[in-house]
């Protein structure tokens, strides 16, 4: 009697082809309960994602889903098809948040393979995908490119044809969309008086506060996004891994660091685009995340709304005021967890 394999072993490097379209399971409806749990797990304090009245006065439709929350949900959909057999998630580029996601919206994800390159060892390769998140109306709410190092099924199989996509260094400010009017911004309620004109290119901001990540918290957060990557959950299996223990999902680092950035960037709560992102080092339970930011650029989007291009650097177990980043050879400091380049909306001076 023959047996049929019904479980999903995930795709290996040989399974990916440029131009391939992957429609991911499972659609997820986001509710106000998701909003509350995300806030509890990340410590988010940005006013437009805390107060429905503030959000509406600022020009948003109401209490929206934090863009990073939507990003993690869309990312989570892709894991069973793209990164179940991944060695590492290497980076992000050309991320665009196109319209607000509201409680009650249902998100699904579709990815296109846009590149691949086998590594010199012959055991792994890098796969580039462009993922689009769509709502229940079929409207695009976000899109981004990421690249992943994936194991080969058979290290002896012939090398695949190389195709490396050309990606923009940053999303141009002229192409930013989805920003609100910010005409009736309540500075007392937002907790900050600082506007676009108060920030200078090259300025560095120490976000001061730290947050220690615990085992239960990071696993609940990762489950919230329906991310099934083995490295975050399988305590027994990870004993034989490179680190010998579970790894915290990189999205936890991004969201916690962004929440810490409230102290210094309290009016820059809405992410408009992701220019680049690198997970420079691993985070484990009981590590403490700190963060600092550098202003890379600024732009005027309307009479009342501007944008800051920011580099957010998350570090672990070290003083963020030391501004750890890279050495003279371009290598990341061992304390650096995340190097995240993004655009955020911010009100302009009245």
Predicted regions and their residues:
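A cross-kingdom feature marking solvent-exposed beta-strand/loop segments within repeated
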Residues: 88-99, 114-115, 270-281, 296
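Short linear motifs in intrinsically disordered/low-complexity regions
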Residues: 94-95, 136, 187, 276, ...
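Short amphipathic alpha-helical patches
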Residues: 61-65, 97-102, 161, 280-285
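Hot-dog-fold acyl-thioester-processing enzymes
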Residues: 2-90, 142, 152-274, 330-339, ...
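HotDog/MaoC-like acyl-thioester-processing domains
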Residues: 2-18, 101-179, 183-184, 285, ...
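Short, structured motif recognition centered on aromatic/hydrophobic residues
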Residues: 38, 92, 107-111, 127-131, ...
